[in-house]
Structures are given as C-alpha cells and as structure tokens.
C-alpha cells in the first residue's frame, strides 16, 4: 500500500508525462506547511522561466511581520506575482501542474489568482 506522499508523487509523475506530451510551458505548484512555491517551466523541462514563492524577501515583507506564507491569501499573492512574471517573460498560456495536490484551498487560490491576472490555462 502506498503512503499518502507516494500517492501524490505518482499522480504528479503522471501529470508531468501528459503535459510533456502536449509540449506546452507548465505552471507547477508546490506547497509546504509554511510556504507555497510556483514556477513556470519550459516545454522540455530544462529551464525555469519564472518563479515566485512566499519564501522571497519581498513577499515576506508584504505579508507583514507574521510572515505567514501558508494561507490562501498568500497563495493569491503568489498567483498574481507568477502571472506578472510569466507575462513579462512573454508567456501567456501554460498547462497547470498541481503536482498531485488536490485542487482545493491554497492550490485553488493560486490558480484562480493567476487566471485573474491574465494567465491562460
């Protein structure tokens, strides 16, 4: 029987394979208890074209003294930042790679904020 983490990693692997077959740039999300990370990765997976996370110094200042990066409000902020950085790099359309995480809570907040900021997926 697979552990919860092994199940998530298996789902993540399958998603990465499907996105690679499509040959499009992907927006990948990773979350921990304290932070959330988003990266835009090239079609072949060799380069990170844009990234944003709650671990960045500028974001931590915006979050305030508490530095809470593990909530939905912080995820929305990261969604907007990653969309702005991707658009600055000339990327309008991506495939959303949620890395096996459920499309709920922080992952959903990040995705919806990125869509509102103009990223298409």
UniProtKB/Swiss-Prot annotation:
One of its GO terms (cellular component) is cytosolic large ribosomal subunit. GO terms for molecular function: 5S rRNA binding; structural constituent of ribosome. Pfam families: Ribosomal_L18p. Keywords: Ribonucleoprotein, Ribosomal protein, RNA-binding, rRNA-binding. It comes from the Bacteria. One of its GO terms (biological process) is translation. Gene3D superfamilies: 3.30.420.100. SUPFAM superfamilies: Translational machinery components. This is one of the proteins that bind and probably mediate the attachment of the 5S RNA into the large ribosomal subunit, where it forms part of the central protuberance. Belongs to the universal ribosomal protein uL18 family. Part of the 50S ribosomal subunit; part of the 5S rRNA/L5/L18/L25 subcomplex. Contacts the 5S and 23S rRNAs. This is Large ribosomal subunit protein uL18.
């Amino acid at each position: 029987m697979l552990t919860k983490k092994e199940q998530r990693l298996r789902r993540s692997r399958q998603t990465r394979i499907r996105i690679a077959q499509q040959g499009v740039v992907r927006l990948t999300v990773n979350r921990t208890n304290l932070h959330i990370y988003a990266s835009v990765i090239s079609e072949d997976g060799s380069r990170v074209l844009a990234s944003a996370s709650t671990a960045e110094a500028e974001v931590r200042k915006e979050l305030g003294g508490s530095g809470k990066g593990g909530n939905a409000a912080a995820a929305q902020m990261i969604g907007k930042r990653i969309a702005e950085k991707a658009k600055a790099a000339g990327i309008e359309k991506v495939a959303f790679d949620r890395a096996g995480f459920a499309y709920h809570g922080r992952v959903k907040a990040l995705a919806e904020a990125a869509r509102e900021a103009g990223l298409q997926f």
